[in-house]
A protein has these predicted regions:
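Alpha-amylase-like alpha-glycosidases and glucanotransferases acting on alpha-linked glucans and related
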Residues: 1-178, 182-189, 200-211
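Glycine/aspartate-rich loop-and-adjacent alpha/beta segment that forms the canonical ThDP
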Residues: 192-194
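C-terminal accessory segments of extracellular proteins
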Residues: 216-224
Length: 224
């Protein structure tokens, strides 16, 4: 790809930029290092980490597409170089509240100090994504001690837990907030979009069939 000036990426991102105001690139870590697997291997177990030409790629992207807006999906266990690459180009990363809130696996103990999600300005905040439980489902799955701590943390806000987290997200310092429809409607896990690592029903089957509740929620959001 580097030999032809990253034509694949320039064409792909350039076309997407005609359709969308902002483009999220998943698995951003692969622009730092990627897992190379021999074509003869039946699984992905055998392979090696290869350093990617991330800086050369993004230099080319911004030279040819200077007005493009990109979000870097920077979740998971990352080496520092991934974040350095992200920050070099001032790309907003992702913050998901469900990952920011500390959970006690056994439900015991109390927080030693008030919790605060690390939502910084140059990031995009989510209550959850398509791969998460809905906020209502996630809260229901927490142990009592964690539920109590979350309730204390969200005390300044009103409504369902999902509505409270939405208010927190909208009032944070982030550049963008992305809210799943299921959280806007305070739906439980029966409306979950996807369970990573699984196939078949009910993944990707949920549909919004009635806009009336959503329209009511939009009016409420305007007051927040």
């Amino acid at each position: 790809m580097e030999k032809d000036g990253f034509k694949f990426w320039i064409d792909r991102l350039g076309f997407n930029a005609t359709l969308f105001d902002v483009i999220r690139i998943d698995h951003f870590r692969a622009f730092d290092t990627y897992w190379k697997i021999p074509a003869t291997c039946p699984t992905a177990v055998e392979g090696a980490w290869i350093e990617a030409p991330g800086y050369a790629l993004f230099d080319t992207i911004y030279k040819q597409l200077p007005n493009i807006n990109i979000i870097a999906e920077d979740l998971g266990d990352l080496r520092p170089q991934v974040l350095q690459l992200r920050d070099h180009y001032k790309l907003p990363g992702m913050k998901i509240f469900q990952f920011e809130f500390p959970i006690y696996p056994d439900g015991s103990g109390r927080m030693p100090k008030p919790i605060s999600p690390t939502f910084v300005e140059n990031s995009v905040a989510y209550t959850g994504t398509h791969d998460n439980q809905t906020t209502m489902g996630w809260f229901a799955s927490l142990k009592a001690a964690s539920q109590e701590q979350l309730a204390i943390f969200l005390k300044p806000f009103t409504g369902t837990v999902a509505e409270q987290l939405i208010q927190l997200t909208l009032q944070s310092a982030v550049k963008f907030a992305i809210l799943p429809m299921q959280d806007l409607l305070s739906l439980d896990d029966t409306a979950r979009m996807n369970v990573p690592g699984t196939i078949g029903s009910p993944n990707w089957e949920w549909k919004l069939k009635d806009f009336s509740a959503f329209e009511t929620m939009i009016k409420k959001i305007k007051t927040w």
